[in-house]
Amino acid sequence: MRRSAVFLFCLACVMLGITVGCKDKKPESSQSDSLAVDVPVDTVDTVVVDTVPEDAMDSLISATPMPQSADELFDDFLFNFSANKKLQYERVTFPLKVVDGDSESFIQYKDWRQEHFFMKQEMYTLIFDDESQLALLSDTTLDSVVVEKINLRAKSVEQHIFNRLDGKWKLTQIVRNTMFQNPNKSFLAFYEKFATDSVFQVESMAEPVSVTLPDPDDDFSMIEGDFYPEQWPEFKPGELPSEELYNIIYGQEYRQSRQKLFVLRGISNGFQTEMTFRQIDGKWKLVKLVN
């Protein structure tokens, strides 16, 4: 993930540089000066942001080759795949097979549209059965990974299936199903309400909840303790994603267990929160929080 963070930081710097460069240009003639006074500032900003930078950014990113090492770790590949349009077209097996329930179709090269996944969000999410499965994030021996796009409102799941072929990750198939066909269906149904209902959140706390937080007096240490349901607002990890979730299946097998580890990961800031939920008397409860 460190290489991914560096890549995204550089990407942000390039975008900033282009935007500032465009805004600092001044009209050369006095006639342009008089016209500029009559043009609303919002209009000028819109032109700068919506036209030049986006095209220029696509060209800059596409001209930057992905390092070979990015094919070793799937996360590194996925960040490059999502941001680099040229690379993405090279790494999709066309015609791309799409399975939608009982029907099959194919997407041709000319009809493909760049898939950014969660790159335009501040964070993405992962679902595991337990903490031991976190080791899969750094596994360089994987040869098949599934990226799930979960629409909570539409109750749908779109799976993007990637396979490593001749040492290179490629998108080989898309499978669409309902959320009710997903092995995490019980947890997803619970989470949809949990993410938006503050009263339900408090009701879904164990008593107490185990918590692990960074030690404010030591950057290299963590402190452990407990909190109770009424203290949840003090420990809640910001705004929870409520409309669309992403989940990456690195090979973990879901055993219809009574426990789920829900992970929130920042795109480029190193932020990570782990929330462990467990079914107690048939109801999902938050039992552990690691920030």
Provide a role label for each language-model segment:
Residues 97-154, 215, 219-271:
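Surface-exposed, charged secondary-structure patches
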Residues 166-203, 212-221:
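Surface-exposed beta-loop interaction hotspot
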Residues 17-21:
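C-terminal motif of bacterial Sec signal peptides marking the signal peptidase cleavage site
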Residues 1-9:
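Bacterial N-terminal signal peptides that target proteins for export
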Residues 22-26:
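Bacterial signal peptide processing site
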Residues 27-30, 34-79, 83, 170-192:
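Short, low-complexity N-terminal intrinsically disordered segments enriched in polar/charged residues
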Residues 152-181, 270-291:
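Short beta-strand edge/turn micro-motifs at domain boundaries
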Residues 34, 43-46, 50-51, 59, ...:
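Coil residues (strongly favoring Ser/Thr
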